[in-house]
Amino acid sequence: MWAERHRAAVELQQFLSSIYEQVKKGESLGPFQYKDDVQVHVVCDGHCKPLENFCSGSEVLYIMEKKPLTLEDNALDETENNEGISFYMSLQESPQPQAIPTMSARQFLTSYTLTHNPNMIQLNSGVPVKVLPPLWVRCDSSDAEGTCWLGAEPIKSNRNEITGMSFRTVTCAGPTADKSTFPSLDSLRQAHKERHYSSAMQTRGFAQYDLFGSNTVENSVIESQSSVTVDFVWNGVERILQLPPLTSAATLNIKVESGDLRSPVYSVYKELDFLLVLAEGLKTGVTEWPETSETKSAVDLVQHLLNDLKNKVDGLSTSVSKKDNEKIKSDTAAVDCSIQSFITERGDLDFAEMLWCKMRKSVSSYQDVVNCFSLVIQSLKHGEMHPWIHRGSSSTLSKLIQESYHGDMQSLSLTGLTPMRMLLEIGLDKMKKDYINCFIGQDLATFNYLDYFICTSVDLQEQVQRVKKLHHMLEVVVVCNAFLSLGHENLFPLTQSCLKYYKENPWNEQHVFQLPIRPSVISTFYQNSHPQTWRVEIISGHGQKEVKTTWQLTSRRPVDHVSFAVPDVPIDMTISGDNEELVYYPTQVSCSQVHFC
């Protein structure tokens, strides 16, 4: 019996060492098949969401599980019924993680522990024990406690020598809305004391609230693509589901995706979207023209703009008509009047910017672009107008206008990609100024901080990418200003965080920006709401001998490989009233240690 256990331990150690080396060399990412129907993943910290609340934050870890069902493993009868067809279709989709029987999982952890015990000379042949990453095993909750995860992690000394093993057991039940079934904090403390013989204990609380799920912003413009949650951490927990005290450390987690139809900056997004269409057309040679929002043709609108400027030269008009000017302003920043606008309208649009505003909503073909620029160039050549442009503008059209001041315009052929490039250039110039006006106008950034994003020394495609970054930053800041009513003291550090991230990273709307904040600033958003996650940690011991018992409630299923009995109430309740209760999954993480010497 012992010989068999030793052999199993050596085989596991050799397998885990081998796949770890493969991953380090970049040869494979797995999963790696072990015996029979068991497979192992090697994952990096932060890449295993199911374990984010349970593991201790190791850089690399193993996850062992049962190999998922596949079409190859499950040939179906030709005479399958509807249920069989449904099963067949489910196999074609991404396979769900499968759990290992809890008893088998314990045996794997036993083998893992044996290989790390320096006293087991017969296993390591006198060679120093090689420390492997932590091992976590998905369990099927087949035991009485409902164990869904088992984990083991070597305890190392300051000299990187193995002195013991730390074990974690994760049990889960639920879902339930019956709070009377939750243990009291005193009973959890007592259980921890009896398990670890601890006299000195401390408690630490954690709670996460979904601010867009609260009554304050119900029916707001933010949909599921965007989320703002707040994490609270505090010491000295008083009771289960305690409201985070105002002395808690609070952090906002902000993820915003552009394109919400009712966003305060949706009109700016649409303008950017057209810019992206042009950039893609320049890159591929094929342009997917969006539907126009103007009833008049692009040529008519541009001709009307030129006529106004001609009349100004002839002294018949002192400015572009008031009606058109107001329309251009509204194009720049159309904001829901029910929400105080964060965007300030620009009143200093030059000719190129006004031309962009006309063309972006009316051109529907390459020929439209050519015809519009032909009208402009002819008017400039004949001296019919002398439009003003912003100093420093580097677009092709701006250079032509500057040359027209001296009656010495260079010849320009509107063929090939030139017209598309000219339109993209004036759009980039205009939008850069819009974003500068916003961030500098709100004292959120200086010109020097924004210089990277508006630089013209890089190619057009890179300029477009940087403008996309500016827009995402704007969306993030606007959400916090419009819906959380955050003031300058919070928006300024948030903007600086966004600027720093986007100077070093590519555009990524899935990135979660974090902002430390005083709980009192956002108290109205969470004090009458239910937490999405609530957790208490009971801690005793110090350093390597620290042990912890964690008990938590989550509104979402905490593990993806175990099925739970569903109660009569909906699992994903929407909190829209004070009398509604949230359904929770109770989870407990227990810790134990074994010391080898």
UniProtKB/Swiss-Prot annotation:
Role: Essential component of the mitotic checkpoint, which prevents cells from prematurely exiting mitosis. Required for the assembly of the dynein-dynactin and mad1-mad2 complexes onto kinetochores.
Keyword Membrane part of the UniProt annotation: no
PANTHER family found in the cross-reference section: PROTEIN ZWILCH HOMOLOG
Key words, A-Z: Cell cycle, Cell division, Centromere, Chromosome, Kinetochore, Mitosis
Lineage of origin: Eukaryota, Metazoa, Chordata, Craniata, Vertebrata
Cell cycle is among the record's keywords: yes
Xref: InterPro entries: Zwilch (IPR018630)
Record-level GO BP terms: cell division; mitotic spindle assembly checkpoint signaling
The name this protein goes by in its record: Protein zwilch homolog
Self-association and partners: Component of the RZZ complex composed of kntc1/rod, zw10 and zwilch.
Organism: Xenopus tropicalis
Alphabetized Pfam families for the sequence: Zwilch
Any Gene Ontology CC annotation: RZZ complex
Family according to the record: Belongs to the ZWILCH family.
Entry's localization field: Chromosome, Centromere, Kinetochore
